[in-house]
Structures are given as C-alpha cells and as structure tokens.
Amino acid sequence: AFLTAVVLFCVTAASIHFFAGSRIEANNREFGTWINSKKDHSYNAVAANLHDDTYLMMGSSEFQHGNNTPYHPTAIFNQANMDVMCIGAAGNQCLPHAIAMGALAPDLKSKKVVLLVSPTWFAKGGIGKSEFSARFSESMYAAMLKNDSLSDDLKQKLIDRTTKLLEVSPLMKANVDRATKVLTGDNLNNGQTQKTSLEDKVNYYIHSWIAQEKERIGVGMMWKLSGHKNNRTYEPQNAKEPDWDALKIQADKEFEKECTNEFYMKDELFKIKYKKVLKERKDSETKRSFEESPEYDDLKLFLDICKDQGIEAKLILLPINGYWY
C-alpha cells in the first residue's frame, strides 16, 4: 500500500509538473496585466517576467473591479502596447508593496514604479494584521532580505513591522523568523546576536524549496487554465501614450446615464445596497478621521526603499466620491 501511494504521488507530481511547465518566464506581455494572487505572491514569477521596458504598477482592489471595461489599467496599457507588471488585490497596502519593492528593485530594469494609493488605507489602525497576513509573501520577504544593496536600516524596519503584524499567524511568523535568522545572521535584529544552527538552515532551505516549487506549479497552472500561453521569446512593442482625454470623455458619457441618484453612485448598486439604509447611516462617519495612521509611516518606508534603490516612484491618489465615500 505504501509503495502504491508513493507511485501515485510521483505520477501525480510529474503530471502537474508537466502541465504547469518547467519555467516561469511567460515572455508574454499579458502576464503582467494578468490579475492573480498566486502571481503576486511569487517573487520568482514576477521577477522572471520583468523586461527592459516593464513598468511596475502596485495597487489593491481596483485591479479586481471593472476589468471588463475599457477604463481598467490592464485594458488601457495592453491597448497601448505598454509592458506593465500589475501587483495587487484587496488587502494590499503600503507595507506589502514596500516588501515587494525591496525584493524586486534589482530586477526592475526600467527603475520605474507606480503606486495606486487608496485614501481608505489611512484609517486609524492602518493595515490590519489579518489583511497583512493574507497578502504577505514569504518569497518576496526572503528576496528582500537577500537584496544586498538594500540598507540594513530599511531591512530592519521591514522586519520589525512584519514580525509585529504576523502575530495573528504563528506558523507564518515562525517561517519568517527562521528566514530572518538564516538570511541575515548577526547583521540585523537590532544588533542582537542570532546563532543560526545547522537545523535552522536545513529546515529553512527545505521549506523554501517546497514553497517555491508550490508557487511555480500554482502560477503555471493558473496561467494556463486562464487560457494564456508562454512564448519562446519576449518581443518589445512600440508603446504609445493612451489618449487620456478621449477616455475621460467616453467614461463620463457612458456612466452619466447609469449614475442618476443624488450621490452619483451606480443606480443598480445604490438601489440594492444603500437606498434602504440612508436614514440610519446619515452622519455616521462624521467623526471618522484619516489624519493619524501608521499607514503614513508605511508609505514613507515604501518611498525610502525606492530612493535607496534608485527607483523613480509615482503616486496616484485614487479619486473618491466626497458625497458618500
């Protein structure tokens, strides 16, 4: 029975390996605008698909909404033949992106990144521990620690913030603590000597290999199941500037007839979700403030990493509807 189980496991593993493919390089511009959390969590998958003309774009839930419209970033940049690597989903805020930036900076040949900043990130508590653990990538974290050009001071800030937020996820925190110990030795951890045992090193490298293999297979399977394919080589296209004025006029015209209520929400959503709670929700957010938040420090950390790594960063503050947002 044991031998049969081993044989079945080997056959299954080999089949998955064959289907997923042996390489992560897609050589396909659509890989960057493919919105998928497994891709976002895999340092190797993202780094392998950063080309000379790739711009990095980081954000959150806006990547998951409106992707069937011509106004979604993926649609706009694909049409303009621009190679953009999008990273982000609901729950992403400045800190996960700061870790990813620290990891990917040496691979980002264009040295350009755009961060889509959502005002709602700057709530009093900043990013929640559960949200952070859900968006945390062990492989991005490890690659950040391996980035020899990133200053020890910035690494230490990322380590401290990560360790605190992962308190709700003991297993993930244990993996992070082990990675930090093995990959930094005595250099960090606020000057405290860390004795890295042979057992720690063996456990880390075994766990790291298994995790990377799972990432590679997971990304490869999802990429192919979504109908995409790998190309033999990457061929840069002649990128062009999107016609922003025309897109704005088109969007205003299209949504004007869909947002006729007093708050300029989409009528369908307003009728289903908000109209019935207007009275009880009135003035409920008047005392809410975004003036103080640890998110500002996380944003500064992101920008400090960009400066340290010679990355040109552009921040886009997402527009919000002041009547109700």
What feature does the model see in each segment?
Residues 59-60, 115-120, 274-277, 316-321:
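Short loop/turn segments at strand-loop or loop-helix junctions that form parts
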Residues 23-33, 80-92, 279-290:
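Acidic/glycine-enriched edge-of-secondary-structure segments
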Residues 52-54, 82, 109-112, 308-314:
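Loop/turn elements at helix/coil->beta-strand transitions in domains of secreted/extracellular proteins
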Residues 1-18:
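Hydrophobic membrane-insertion alpha-helices, especially the h-region
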Residues 143-297:
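Secreted/periplasmic serine-hydrolase-like ester/acetyl group-modifying domain
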Residues 76, 284, 291-325:
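Extended hydrophobic/aromatic segments used for targeting, binding, or gating
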Residues 23-82, 99-101:
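Membrane/wall-proximal cationic-aromatic binding patches
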Residues 63-157:
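Membrane-embedded segments
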